[in-house]
UniProtKB/Swiss-Prot annotation:
This is Non-structural protein 2. Residues 29-64 form a coiled coil. It comes from the Viruses. It comes from Banna virus. Pfam families: Seadorna_VP6 (PF07407). The gene is Segment-6.
Length: 425
């Protein structure tokens, strides 16, 4: 490259030309080679610009891709939040007569229903206009809303509350409990007014025996020739059974003939529960009476709506309702004697044809299994006669019973016996 230096001296212009280092380096290079180098340099510049443009596009694409990914993630989050909100609003939605009540409108309708019985017809009409008047711009819809509110019954409040509280509950037994408790709370009364004939009681047909000759009881029976020492049972006067076993056998023999091995089940009711054989458990609209109560366990007809091994019910007490959870119990044993037919017929046939030394019942996932040990040789097969002794027939002479009870005490005027004074006071 040529650099021109202009010096001003004595008003004369002197031009001095110096050669740069580049020019010195290009000495000996031909013109054609110089042109080729310039073309190559231009080509490299173009490639460099193309690479810069491509890099810019890639960076732009990466930025766009990142933005798109973030937007898609936000859309997914918004969609998920929307579904959650919709699910949260579902229990608040009450549909009737093609009208959807939710949120504020549902609260207003509930408030109206709470005062409905306290207001006259004219006053209630004014209340409706004041609280929900002009709620819908559609006149037909508004008219149907007002008509619906007037037709509501008082306990529809309980229905609505129960519908909300049980919306996400999968256990039908628990849903029935919430429904009943809502009814009781809103109406301030026990709405479970159950008639006696409606109670599921599989022991109702007492004094009816179903011993049959066509029943094969041997799968449930083990022969033992050795007669144990002791006395006969207090019910049948024939078997060497403990009082508890005799009472259980007696109960099973009086079950409804249609109850088979899958028709009864054992449940754990808890040791703190005041429970007896006269108690009634309400499960999803029906009342059930226990067959047998043994401490913290109870035998029931197989209860409906079992959910994960549990049945939710309501224990009917004199003072109202008490929720109760009955846990299904299975014996972890590998035994035979599965009862495939009528339990009452099988047990009654055993009692009639055998002299029993022991009697065990097991509750398995396949049904009830019975294991009895005894002797069926030289046994008098007689008709079963149990209930007179089973329920403890009292002596005819009540006076002699009292005298025998306090035998050895000096009773009469001047007696210091506290028991005698208590009876005669």
């Amino acid at each position: 490259m040529m650099i021109a230096l202009i010096q001003m001296k004595n008003m004369k212009c002197t031009l001095k030309v110096e050669e740069t280092t580049e020019n010195q380096e290009l000495e000996g290079v031909s013109f054609d080679e110089l042109v080729a180098l310039r073309e190559e340099n231009a080509k490299l510049k173009q490639e460099n610009e193309a690479l810069k443009a491509k890099l810019h596009r890639l960076e732009s694409d990466w930025t766009t891709s990142d933005i798109v990914e973030k937007v898609e993630l936000m859309d997914a989050q918004f969609d998920r939040i929307g579904k959650i909100m919709d699910k949260m609003r579902e229990p608040m939605l009450f549909k009737r007569d093609e009208i959807e009540l939710h949120g504020d409108l549902l609260a207003r309708v509930e408030g109206l229903l709470r005062i409905k019985n306290e207001r006259s017809e004219i006053e209630f009409e004014k209340d409706i206009q004041c609280i929900v008047g002009r709620c819908f711009s559609d006149e037909n819809k508004q008219r149907n809303l007002e008509k619906m509110i007037k037709s509501f019954e008082y306990d529809d409040i309980a229905d609505t509350i129960a519908l909300r509280l049980t919306h996400f509950i999968q256990d039908p037994g628990l849903r029935s409990i919430v429904y009943a408790m809502c009814k009781a709370a809103v109406l301030n009364q026990n709405y479970l007014n159950i008639e006696v004939q409606e109670i599921v009681d599989v022991t109702r047909q007492k004094y009816t025996h179903n011993a049959r000759d066509d029943i094969d009881f041997y799968p449930m029976f083990t022969f033992d020739a050795n007669v144990p020492e002791g006395v006969f049972d207090h019910i049948y006067k024939k078997h060497y059974l403990s009082p508890q076993s005799a009472a259980l056998v007696h109960t099973l023999s009086h079950l409804d003939v249609n109850v088979d091995g899958n028709g009864i089940a054992m449940y754990h009711i808890g040791s703190a529960t005041r429970f007896a054989e006269c108690s009634v458990v309400y499960v999803d609209g029906r009342a059930y009476k226990p067959i047998r109560v043994m401490a913290e366990y109870a035998i029931f007809p197989t209860l409906p709506h079992e959910y994960k091994g549990r049945v939710e019910g309501l224990l009917l007490l004199h003072g109202g309702l008490a929720p109760i959870t009955l846990v299904r119990v299975y014996h972890d044993v590998n035994v035979g004697g599965l009862v495939t037919g009528s339990i009452a017929a099988s047990v009654s046939t055993l009692l009639r044809n055998c002299m029993l030394y022991s009697f065990d019942i097991y509750f398995t996932p396949n049904g009830v299994c019975i294991n009895a040990v005894g002797n069926n040789n030289f046994v008098n097969i007689i008709d079963i006669n149990c209930c007179g002794r089973a329920f403890g027939k009292a002596p005819l002479d009540q006076g002699s019973w009292n005298r025998n009870k306090f035998m050895g005490h000096k009773h009469g005027r001047g007696s210091k016996c506290k028991q005698y004074k208590k009876i005669n006071s």
